[in-house]
Amino acid sequence: MQVSVETTEGLGRRMTVQVPAEQVEEKVDQRLRSLRGNVRMDGFRPGKVPLKVVRKRYGPQVRGEVLSELVQSTYSEALREKELRPAGNPEIEPKQTEEGKDLEYQATFEVLPSFEVTGLDQIKVERPQVEITDADVDEVLERLRKQQAEYNEVDRASQEGDRVVIDFKGTVDGEEFSGNEGNDVPVVLGAGQMPPAFEEGLTGVKAGDETTIEHTFPEEFPDSEVAGKAGQFAVTVKTVEAPEYPEIDDAFAEKVGVKEGGVEKLREAIKTNLERERDQTVASRVKHQVMDQLLDITDIELPKVLVDAEIDQLRQQEQSRQQQSGQEEPDDLPAALFEENARRRVALGLIVNELVRSNDIKLDRDRVMQSLQEMAAGYEQPEEVLRYYAQNRQLMEGVEVAVLEDQVVDYVVQQAQVEDKPMSLQELMSPQQPEAESAEGESKQDETKE
């Protein structure tokens, strides 16, 4: 077999493969002789049909099958010989397939980039240090208490903490829109479940009042027909209800799910949950900083085939999200909407894979099991969840990739300049830091290509 490779543009490669005619014809003859034993034809005993007759009838079909198989096997062999790592499936163009001549074809594809990740000691990470206090537990208890409130109608103007039950109907530019009306909708003032303009408009109203509330939809509102536009909502107040909050005692603890141990066990459970949320948020913040700076310090050329595949995946996710939210069938979303995010995700996937490869980072099976157990603990039947994951290889791979990414982050943090920053739980949980992105899709994709 002869193999030659030329660079087309950037990461593009064109590989020409020649397979000797003798090898091709030997494979064809072997297949025909094997087929001969099963051929049934009038005038011949079973298995005794002359080879030339079998060749005449089945030769073209068998030859096509053999050529297809040879292309697949020799393509993989040629990649190994030339030490090439394709980023996606090739385009195969046959050049010579005539009987008695060498098989020749060209495979066009992109390769994964060759690069190094250096300068990890220049990465700076600010790691939050948060202690869960009694005040943090008290705050959660108070929220639980308010969630268990019982509401009773009152004959007075509404105020913060009250529940106002309303009917509403909205228009934009005088036209109705999807989801523009609701009946018997409960709104707890101060809970943040409605836009500020709504809560302000519903403060100080009484049962039977009719009012109009104006609200401008944000530019990023999912429904593009009303995004960024001002809406007018005609509102009828059905009832105003004042809350009555329960005492925090053992009966309250049992009501919110703590069957034994009363308030003391409830406080312990709350603290445990807060510690878990803290740890997850700290890990997310650290991961985001690491990923940002890995992108900054690494110069990498991205295979177009991977970026295009990621764009398609992000587009499908957005279309699915729009459909699930009850919006009309979305129009074809342009690739430009997703390109920046797609390039970022692909780059991170390649960088993570390179760090795994170059530093021989092995998947920690104990961490995989720990991650599964923590996830399953949030369900009523954790054992069933664990069993389901164990039987679903695709789901398990997702957990494994996420754990491997966390191991890469840990490795980078060990090399980086880390500053521990004390802060309160409220500071930590404030929505100021974007959620750490994952290179999961790309990591899995690229691992299969190596």
UniProtKB/Swiss-Prot annotation:
GO CC aspect terms: cytoplasm
Biased composition (Basic and acidic residues): 441-450
Localisation: Cytoplasm
Record field: catalytic activity: [protein]-peptidylproline (omega=180) = [protein]-peptidylproline (omega=0)
Record GO biological process: 'de novo' cotranslational protein folding; cell division; chaperone-mediated protein folding; protein transport; protein unfolding
Domain PPIase FKBP-type: 161-246
InterPro entries, sorted: PPIase_dom_sf, PPIase_FKBP_dom, Trig_fac, Trigger_fac_C, Trigger_fac_C_sf, Trigger_fac_ribosome-bd_bac, Trigger_fac_ribosome-bd_sf, Trigger_fact/SurA_dom_sf
The enzyme's E.C. designation: 5.2.1.8
SUPFAM superfamilies per record: FKBP-like, Triger factor/SurA peptide-binding domain-like, Trigger factor ribosome-binding domain
Location of the region described as Disordered in the Swiss-Prot/TrEMBL record: 422-450
Cleaved signal peptide residues: none
Keywords from the named record: Cell cycle, Cell division, Chaperone, Cytoplasm, Isomerase, Rotamase
Molecular function GO labels: peptidyl-prolyl cis-trans isomerase activity; protein folding chaperone; ribosome binding
Role this protein plays: Involved in protein export. Acts as a chaperone by maintaining the newly synthesized protein in an open conformation. Functions as a peptidyl-prolyl cis-trans isomerase.
Domain observations: Consists of 3 domains; the N-terminus binds the ribosome, the middle domain has PPIase activity, while the C-terminus has intrinsic chaperone activity on its own.
Family affiliation: Belongs to the FKBP-type PPIase family. Tig subfamily.
PANTHER family attached to this UniProt entry: TRIGGER FACTOR CHAPERONE AND PEPTIDYL-PROLYL CIS/TRANS ISOMERASE, TRIGGER FACTOR-LIKE PROTEIN TIG, CHLOROPLASTIC
Protein name per the record: Trigger factor
Organism: Alkalilimnicola ehrlichii (strain ATCC BAA-1101 / DSM 17681 / MLHE-1)
